[in-house]
From Swiss-Prot:
<feature type="transmembrane region" description="Helical">
    <location>
        <begin position="82"/>
        <end position="102"/>
    </location>
</feature>
<dbReference type="InterPro" id="IPR018086">
    <property type="entry name" value="NADH_UbQ_OxRdtase_su1_CS"/>
</dbReference>
<comment type="function">
    <text>NDH-1 shuttles electrons from NADH, via FMN and iron-sulfur (Fe-S) centers, to quinones in the respiratory chain. The immediate electron acceptor for the enzyme in this species is believed to be ubiquinone. Couples the redox reaction to proton translocation (for every two electrons transferred, four hydrogen ions are translocated across the cytoplasmic membrane), and thus conserves the redox energy in a proton gradient. This subunit may bind ubiquinone.</text>
</comment>
<comment type="similarity">
    <text>Belongs to the complex I subunit 1 family.</text>
</comment>
<feature type="transmembrane region" description="Helical">
    <location>
        <begin position="183"/>
        <end position="203"/>
    </location>
</feature>
<feature type="transmembrane region" description="Helical">
    <location>
        <begin position="325"/>
        <end position="345"/>
    </location>
</feature>
<feature type="transmembrane region" description="Helical">
    <location>
        <begin position="9"/>
        <end position="29"/>
    </location>
</feature>
<feature type="transmembrane region" description="Helical">
    <location>
        <begin position="282"/>
        <end position="302"/>
    </location>
</feature>
<feature type="transmembrane region" description="Helical">
    <location>
        <begin position="108"/>
        <end position="128"/>
    </location>
</feature>
<keyword id="KW-0997">Cell inner membrane</keyword>
<keyword id="KW-0520">NAD</keyword>
<dbReference type="GO" id="GO:0048038">
    <property type="term" value="F:quinone binding"/>
</dbReference>
<keyword id="KW-0472">Membrane</keyword>
<keyword id="KW-0874">Quinone</keyword>
<dbReference type="InterPro" id="IPR001694">
    <property type="entry name" value="NADH_UbQ_OxRdtase_su1/FPO"/>
</dbReference>
<feature type="transmembrane region" description="Helical">
    <location>
        <begin position="241"/>
        <end position="261"/>
    </location>
</feature>
<dbReference type="GO" id="GO:0016655">
    <property type="term" value="F:oxidoreductase activity, acting on NAD(P)H, quinone or similar compound as acceptor"/>
</dbReference>
Length: 345
């Protein structure tokens, strides 16, 4: 019998490689969708339909010279991109891809997610500080302030889901969303305010437009990674796209039924052999990926639809609007759990 640690290691290996491939596909998808929105062709020269363009970009990063700023802290400067990638890949281990298919099935999975989201601030801050550049430092400080500000609202949105599901385990949160019927059991229907807040804060946490203040080209050149080149810059690039993909996964997992197939109970009633089968697991995985692909498209769509916030507007939205609304929403759901006997902690 194969030990459980071997299965965990194999699962982690597969997830890491899947995230690497997904990041490449996201780069290609963003370029093509952006080109479509801007009415231009997009990459179409490297390989059929430009499909090999992301791999050409990786080769470019590998072959580029790695320039180290003269007065920088060399060790921290080199470790910052590694920290970002490791945290992004670790977060991917919490995603339930189908019923029973998850690398780390933790009873405190939600707390683990919030913890990993919090410590990702360190990679950005250390990159800005260690570069010995005012642009990098300001970009790092902006990013830290932004991420800390929006983590509070994100945490409250997640707490509202935990109160409804009565569990901190992602698998149980997904399964709880099957209790209300085809789509009515989704937390997006039961908790629309929490869903909207989580989506907005996910944009801010991943530094995606219109919340990409740490990389405001007009003010800070490239922000916290201004002084990075070669594969170190490529690692920041990779971490950003992996975080974007993972954010889409957790939006779907927490609010849109995760891997649950619409009308899944009816399908199992018609075909009882489906229950617990490999075919059902494949259907669940396809359902999850379709939902995730939609939200990945939404990230691109929003980037080319809304202008970037000013820094004071960014802070105002986070502290003056999102945080009070998220807190009020969590309190109302907690009262509902107590007064109406809903499933709670």
């Amino acid at each position: 019998m194969i030990p459980s640690m071997v299965w965990t290691a194999l699962g982690a290996f597969l997830v890491i490689n899947a995230m690497l491939l997904s990041a490449s596909l996201l780069v290609f998808a963003e370029r093509r969708v952006s080109a479509f929105i801007q009415n231009r062709p997009g990459p179409n020269r490297v390989g059929p339909l430009g499909l090999l363009q992301p791999f050409a970009d990786v080769l470019k990063f590998v072959l580029k010279e790695d320039v180290q700023p003269a007065q920088s802290n060399k060790f921290i400067h080199s470790m910052a991109p590694v920290v970002m990638v490791v945290i992004a890949m670790t977060t991917a281990s919490l995603i339930p891809f189908a019923e029973g298919v998850v690398v780390a099935d933790l009873n405190v999975g939600v707390i683990m997610l919030l913890a990993l989201t919090s410590i990702s601030v360190y990679g950005v801050t250390l990159a800005g500080w260690s570069s010995n550049s005012k642009f990098s430092l300001l970009g790092g400080l902006r990013s830290a302030a932004q991420m800390v500000s929006y983590e509070l609202s994100m945490g409250l949105a997640v707490i509202s889901v935990v109160l409804i599901a009565g569990s901190l385990n992602f698998m149980e949160i997904v399964e709880h969303q099957s209790s209300g019927g085809a789509l009515l059991g989704w937390n997006a229907v039961r908790n629309p305010i929490g869903c909207l807040i989580f989506i907005v804060t996910a944009f801010a946490e991943t530094n995606r437009a219109p919340f990409d203040l740490p990389e405001a080209e007009e003010e800070l050149v490239a922000g916290y990674h201004t002084e990075y080149s070669g594969m170190k810059f490529g690692m920041f690039f990779l971490a950003e796209y992996v975080n974007w993909f993972i954010a889409s996964f957790f939006i779907v997992t927490l609010f849109f039924g995760g891997y649950l197939v619409p009308l899944e109970p009816q399908l199992i009633a018609l075909f009882p052999a489906l229950e617990g089968s490999t075919l059902l697991a494949l259907l669940q995985f396809v359902s999850l990926m379709l939902k995730v692909s939609f939200f990945s498209f939404v990230f691109i769509w929003v980037r080319w639809t809304f202008p970037r916030f000013k820094y004071n507007q960014l802070m105002k939205v986070g502290w003056k609007y999102l945080l009070p609304i998220a807190l009020a929403n969590a309190i109302l759901i907690a009262l509902g759990v107590v007064l109406f006997g809903a499933v709670g902690l």
